[in-house]
Amino acid sequence: MEVSIINVNSDKIGTIDLNPLIFSVDYRPDILKMVVNWQLSKRRAGTHKAKTIGDISGTTAKPYRQKHTGRARQGSLRSPQFRGGAVIFGPVVRNHAYSLNKKVRKLGLKVALSLKNSCNKLLILDSIDVNFVKTTQVLQFIRNFEHKSFLIIDKDYNKNVVCSCRNLHNVTLLKQIGTNVLDILRHDCIILTVGAVKYLEERLL
């Protein structure tokens, strides 16, 4: 599969062959859902906590005698039916992450890249190395394409690139080692450098 390579001025400077085993995979929404849910579960902090009856400070004495008061019998003021009492079956601190097969994770990344490629929302850039900080140059580049948001994936990026893009709310920089399904699906257009393409082919094959 032959795709054009562009430069930062949006000029076509050559072509590159994309491996169809990565960029032309059948659409699998079930796989995408599995990988996205796995990523979101790993992202959860799991610090939610409600106090049980053993966590609440206060007296442990019986509030009043068992009989002859006309009221329902009670054994503790820390019980859940009282104001300031415990929470029954409340959330506890735990880890929400779970394991997902490596083959499924790889397939999810292939499906996500293939989806963007099939929708003509995948661009191949020769390089994003710049010698100076210039947000205007990046802005002019992305305005050549009618997309709402951009994810730029490169082998590595220098400080000038980071400073040029960080003030643009619809542009996200990502190192190739951090390529993931969630970020690909959240952005409208994916921009891969030639180095990132080679890395992904080695990683996913």
From Swiss-Prot:
Listed A to Z, the keywords are:
Ribonucleoprotein, Ribosomal protein, RNA-binding, rRNA-binding
Positions of the UniProt region annotated as Disordered = 56-78
One Gene Ontology CC term in the entry: ribosome
GO MF annotations, alphabetized: rRNA binding; structural constituent of ribosome
According to the lineage, what is the superkingdom? Bacteria
Q: Which InterPro entries match?
A: Ribosomal_uL4, Ribosomal_uL4-like, Ribosomal_uL4_dom_sf
Q: Is Ion transport one of the keywords UniProt gives this record?
A: no
List, in alphabetical order, the GO biological process terms annotated in this UniProt record.
translation
The UniProt entry, under Pfam families, shows: Ribosomal_L4
**What family classification does the UniProt entry report for this protein?**
Belongs to the universal ribosomal protein uL4 family.
State the function annotated in the UniProt record.
One of the primary rRNA binding proteins, this protein initially binds near the 5'-end of the 23S rRNA. It is important during the early stages of 50S assembly. It makes multiple contacts with different domains of the 23S rRNA in the assembled 50S subunit and ribosome. Forms part of the polypeptide exit tunnel.
Quaternary structure, per UniProt, is:
Part of the 50S ribosomal subunit.
Instruction: Please give the name of this protein.
Output: Large ribosomal subunit protein uL4
- What organism is the protein native to? Ehrlichia canis (strain Jake)
Q: Which gene encodes it?
A: rplD
